[in-house]
Amino acid sequence: MPSPALLCCCLVLLAGVGASRHQSTLSEDDCTHFPASLPHMLRELRAAFGRVKTFFQMKDKLDNILLTGSLLEDFKGYLGCQALSEMIQFYLEEVMPRAENHDPDIKDHVNSLGEKLKTLRLRLRRCHRFLPCENKSKAVEQVKSAFSKLQEKGVYKAMSEFDIFINYIETYMTMRMKI
């Protein structure tokens, strides 16, 4: 007859296998339903951006465009995955932390926008079909370089064009859903 310790170990092992199998099913289900939930996630991003859009666009006095057509072409091309991944990282790590410090009245709204973008990134990473990439995007490098050259004004420029970024996300995701 097996010892109680051995029985306990077997039960723990079986519970772990069952839980991981259940988790795998949940993850697959999330990915199955992800295309249907994407429009809602994009609406939430747009609504969150709407709370800070006027502030940043009023502060953006520059005539140039940071998020150019070449970035959209990267989103549409074979580098779409990498461009999207890098741009999400760029906004989360470089733009939004600096944007939060510009006015206490918008800090919570920028933070909320960042949390929604993090949620989107997490969902994209879980569903490898949408973010299976490794290569670097030259267009993203150009955006980052232009952003750096603009110094403090770069935050206003990048945040004022966040709606363009949302549109690029939508273009990329729409293309990936057709695959």
From Swiss-Prot:
Gene Ontology CC terms: extracellular space
Keywords annotated in UniProt: Cytokine, Disulfide bond, Glycoprotein, Secreted, Signal
Pfam families linked: IL10
Organism superkingdom: Eukaryota
Disulfide bonds: 31-127, 81-133
SMART domains: IL10
Annotated glycosylation sites: 135
Subcellular location: Secreted
Database matches in PROSITE patterns: INTERLEUKIN_10
The keyword Cytoplasm belongs to this UniProt entry's keyword annotation: no
Segment forming the signal sequence: 1-19
Family stated for the protein in its record: Belongs to the IL-10 family.
PANTHER family linked: INTERLEUKIN-10 (PTHR48482:SF5), INTERLEUKIN-19-RELATED (PTHR48482)
Protein function: Major immune regulatory cytokine that acts on many cells of the immune system where it has profound anti-inflammatory functions, limiting excessive tissue disruption caused by inflammation. Mechanistically, IL10 binds to its heterotetrameric receptor comprising IL10RA and IL10RB leading to JAK1 and STAT2-mediated phosphorylation of STAT3. In turn, STAT3 translocates to the nucleus where it drives expression of anti-inflammatory mediators.
Assembly behavior: Homodimer. Interacts with IL10RA and IL10RB.
Name of the protein in question: Interleukin-10
Native source organism of the sequence: Vulpes vulpes (Red fox)
Gene: IL10
